[in-house]
Amino acid sequence: MKKIYLYIVLTLVFCNFGFADSLRVVDGDTIVLNGEKIRFSGIDTPELKQTCMNGDEKVFCGKTAKMLLIKKIGNETPECISEGKDAYKRTLAECFVNGESLSSYLVRSGYAFAYRKYSKKFIKDEEFAKENKLGMWSMKFQYPWDFRKAS
């Protein structure tokens, strides 16, 4: 009887691993969830190698955006609503943790920008961060799209 019980428990444990969500944060606006590369729609974050200047101090604002996202997600699994694919075949989506938009959170924190070229959805969040000098709005920075053009 103990062997049967042990077999059932082990089977349930190993079956659950097959359904476990795999998550990797690539940068501030891109994750890989269960093998699918997801780009947060409507926002743009600094590139990982991009820096900002906080007075005389160089800050890796792209890495800071990534770390902020990792911290916000914690041990949760984001729920993403797909909005199609981009030119690089990534899924464009808005993702949520505990009902809160990760995109809105990043923009309101000042470590992402409303990507007006593609969406107007996060402009109020950006205005809030800018008015309150949050995140990059308290530093000298280059917009991510300008940084990519210059690189």
Q: Where in the sequence are the language-model features?
A:
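Small beta-barrel nucleic-acid-binding modules, primarily SNase/OB-fold domains
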Residues: 2-151
